[in-house]
């Protein structure tokens, strides 16, 4: 028998002995909780359970109601009396004289120690042993079954047990464990109750009363699932309920913005970012997950780096991120109004560095943008790339993409005069007449210098530069047109 079991037995048996020895006048004092030993399970406060929530809870029979309640009316106290070492040996001897397992259960049942306190004492949440190979866990589950049989299922509800076990296992492992309960005599009723509670039978009944998804979320205590929320069948049932609620009431009653707000209020932002990405893999939730990612991106600057980290962790390609952010609909007229596009370009650089792959090279990037934004001309792209040069960490990328366009223009014999007109479309003017700080003018200057260097040599290039520096773009254009 493990040291932990002996410790548990010692505690439980001693508490039972102290209970029997407590004088009548001290009966009330014996009920005081030793806060340094016990950790109470979370229950819903009266302010959380509104009228709709109470109606929601009344929908179910005795077993299913157990799924959505967090009440715990059982005294979870331990006695704080100091142990008398002279009695310890006698207690241990009496307990082990009979069946050790039954003796532990019997002694524990007399102690009024709550199952969660025993769970914490055995450190079951930190155990690395597989669920079905952990004798301490199996013994503890039998204690839970006995505790519920004596005090009622609400004394330690299915949700209490589910979220406690979820701390140490995945949702799939927990599902297998619960199925195995029904093959173990002492756990058969516990397994039946939990399977019924996790079956999702509550969805259709609750929908009839049009209970707000926020109330259902709180009542199901989904925030207790933490980072394992997506693994929980209860969460998937809630998502299905939210979808049906929207279909019945209209999206404006519980839209994606409301769902995002609920997540942000009940979990850390990092967990929200991860959850939104994982929702893309839930049937029927891909578009909603993407929409909430965009909402979060626009409303929280602190979340953007977290989103980059999550995408990298799950190997989300730049092309996929482009779709998630719906950049195909984003205007590309000015850098200062394109926060999402700027961050996407930064993600491209991050992805390259993270994967060590030359994904979306400068040439590929230009073609990708041309394909995804067919209504944008290469002249507009060149101007946008020019404005990107003002973003320090994107300057090199912008120069490379712009240079690729310049190479094509030079190859097709576009001279500076023709380019000056094309860049200004749809305005009835020419780039040379625009202010010097205008991206269109700056793009024309960049191409004129590129053209002159390759067509006219260093001497002519220096002459054109001097004319431009002296605010004489017309003279610079005239000189550049002499290049052969």
UniProtKB/Swiss-Prot annotation:
Intracellular or extracellular location(s): Secreted; Host cell membrane
Record motif RxLR-dEER, residues: 55-79
Upregulating conditions: Expression is induced during host plant infection.
Keywords in alphabetical order: Host cell membrane, Host membrane, Membrane, Secreted, Signal, Virulence
Leader sequence segment: 1-20
A GO CC term attached to the entry: membrane
Keyword Endoplasmic reticulum: no
Function: Effector that enhances P.infestans colonization of Nicotiana benthamiana leaves.
Domain notes: The RxLR-dEER motif acts to carry the protein into the host cell cytoplasm through binding to cell surface phosphatidylinositol-3-phosphate.
Family label: Belongs to the RxLR effector family.
Protein's name in the database: RxLR effector protein PexRD18
Gene name of the encoded protein: PexRD18
